[in-house]
Amino acid sequence: ICTNNCAGYKGCNYACPLNDHPIAYKSCEGEFDPKSKCPR
């Protein structure tokens, strides 16, 4: 389930955190998007 974990951070809306990489985020399509990074 994808939810907005980075409200207020540009490019981080509707991202899924990766359990093995808390700073990196996956897009809701399920593919890693290097642009969708934000603080936890």
From Swiss-Prot:
Cysteines joined through disulfide linkages: C2-C16, C6-C28, C12-C38
Domain of life: Eukaryota
Keyword annotations: Disulfide bond, Protease inhibitor, Secreted, Serine protease inhibitor
GO CC annotations on file: extracellular region
UniProt-annotated location(s): Secreted
Subcellular location, principal: secreted
Site feature: Reactive bond: K26, S27
Gene Ontology molecular function: serine-type endopeptidase inhibitor activity
Family per record: Belongs to the protease inhibitor I20 (potato type II proteinase inhibitor) family.
Function of the protein: Inhibits chymotrypsin and subtilisin strongly.
Name used for this protein in its record: Proteinase inhibitor IIB
